[in-house]
């Protein structure tokens, strides 16, 4: 029976990497389980590359890309792909943007034709642009009807003092309204150049024929001068912060952050392990303590946000607002226990198994595997770092988790956000509560 390590080593060994003369990086994985393909063209530019006045332009470009090129009408793009049994989609993150086509293997050539055209020769029709701006603005308004979205947008703004992750990917109404066709073309010309892109193909395809098609559609794409972006150093907060959003909701929502790691940092896998131990399901420490033992929360979970830039460790859930103060106290005590006493071998081994199992499971489909390869290539610079991640998880020790928890779980850098019908306490009470913590080793 194959071990998880063997599975990942086999996966990495089968990837073919090639760089075209124009600088485009190509990753191909021969996915032989089914006659399917995922073709993903990713650009290393996300919302964090925008200036304040450009907030939302990356996302708006993503919306506009499928709206027609110099030679193709909108119906010649999505409609053609769907007629061949496939589908198209795209997403914008803080760090990169991806456009993809998925479907039967027979769709590959058409996917190359369409993606190379829409990404390099979009028309950005002014009438269509005005219509799409309204769609995006409506999307903004709908998002703010979601309590967690509202909570996290405010939390990100408070958690980052300088780094552009503090802005929502979708942008702001005033910036989106201001964009003209020339603005989109200018931004695209600064970043949409082959050496700033990765083409990922995962499918049941013959290698020689595939690279011949890639050369046909991508080798002559124009080189553009890549704009250099300098990112600010993030200072994070030096004192506990509190944001309270008052809305007529039936239950209370909470979300906390502490400084985290970049995915390029050696500590990132250890924070994933800590997240699994603290908030990964009903056997996690926070669930057992705050839900099962004390019944303070309705739901609770954690996640480690490890992007290209500085990350965050996040704890969030729902609860009766009357319990908010006690929730902060109990969460911080659980974090302090790990700093003082670590975790058990059983907890660590269970977290390792869960993370690697989820990691492998998410890479079993052609689309999932293209996402895995893409994220490692774009954030860490090489898809082969899948093996770095696997090794870091497998060899992590209790001492590693104690060291990392001491480094990142500083309650003085806690940012707390609540959403409820009314405010229950001020930031001074939060600071007093943190000052009075008395953790006891478990």
Explain the meaning of each model-derived region.
Residues 23, 32-81, 256, 266-278, ...:
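Active/ligand-binding-proximal structured segments within catalytic/core domains
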Residues 16, 25, 252-256, 311-313, ...:
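Short beta-strand micro-motifs in enzyme catalytic cores
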Residues 10-12, 239, 400:
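Residues that act as N-cap/strand-start positions at coil-to-secondary-structure junctions
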Residues 12, 35, 95-96, 250, ...:
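Short acidic/glycine-enriched loop/turn segments that link adjacent beta-strands
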Residues 19, 76-226, 233, 244, ...:
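Charge-rich, well-structured scaffold segments of protease-associated domains
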Residues 25, 46, 86, 261-262:
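Short beta-turn/strand-loop junction motif enriched in small, turn-promoting residues
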């Amino acid at each position: 029976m194959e071990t998880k390590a063997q599975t990942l080593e086999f996966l990495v060994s089968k990837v073919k990497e090639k760089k075209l003369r124009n600088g485009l990086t190509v990753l191909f994985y021969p996915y032989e389980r089914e006659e399917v393909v995922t073709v993903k063209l990713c650009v290393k530019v996300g919302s964090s590359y925008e200036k304040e006045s450009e907030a939302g332009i990356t996302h708006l470009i993503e919306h506009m890309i499928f709206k027609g090129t110099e030679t193709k009408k909108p119906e010649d793009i999505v409609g053609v792909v769907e007629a061949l049994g496939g589908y198209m989609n795209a997403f914008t993150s803080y760090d990169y943007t991806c456009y993809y086509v998925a479907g039967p293997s027979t769709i590959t050539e058409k996917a190359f034709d369409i993606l190379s055209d829409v990404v390099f020769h979009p028309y950005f029709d002014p009438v269509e642009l005005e219509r799409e701006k309204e769609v995006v603005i409506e999307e903004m308004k709908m998002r703010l009807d979601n309590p967690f979205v509202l909570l996290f947008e405010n939390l990100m703004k408070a958690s980052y003092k300088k780094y552009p992750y503090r802005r929502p990917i979708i942008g702001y109404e005033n910036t989106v309204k201001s964009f003209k066709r020339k603005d989109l073309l200018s931004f695209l010309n600064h970043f949409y150049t082959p050496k700033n892109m990765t083409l990922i193909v995962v499918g049941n395809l013959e290698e020689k024929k595939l690279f011949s098609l890639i050369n046909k559609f991508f080798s002559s794409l124009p080189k553009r001068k890549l704009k250099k972006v300098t990112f600010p150093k993030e200072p994070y907060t030096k004192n506990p912060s509190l944001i309270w959003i008052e809305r007529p909701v039936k239950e209370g929502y909470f979300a906390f952050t502490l400084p985290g790691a970049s995915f390029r940092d050696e500590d990132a896998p250890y924070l994933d392990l800590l997240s699994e131990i603290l908030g990964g399901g009903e056997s996690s420490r926070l669930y057992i303590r705050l839900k099962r033992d004390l019944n303070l929360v309705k739901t609770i979970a954690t996640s480690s946000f490890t992007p290209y830039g500085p990350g965050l460790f996040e704890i969030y859930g729902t609860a009766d607002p009357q319990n908010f103060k006690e929730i902060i106290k109990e969460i911080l005590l659980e974090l302090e226990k790990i700093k003082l006493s670590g975790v058990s071998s059983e907890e660590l081994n269970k977290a390792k198994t869960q993370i690697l199992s989820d990691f492998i499971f998410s890479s079993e489909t052609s689309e999932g595997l293209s996402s895995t390869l893409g994220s490692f290539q774009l954030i860490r610079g090489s898809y082969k770092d899948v093996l770095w991640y696997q090794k870091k998880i497998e060899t992590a020790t209790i001492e590693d988790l104690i060291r990392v928890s001491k480094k990142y779980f500083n309650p003085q850098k806690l940012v707390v956000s609540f959403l409820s019908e009314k405010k229950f306490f001020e930031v001074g009470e939060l600071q007093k509560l943190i000052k009075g913590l008395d953790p006891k080793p478990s």
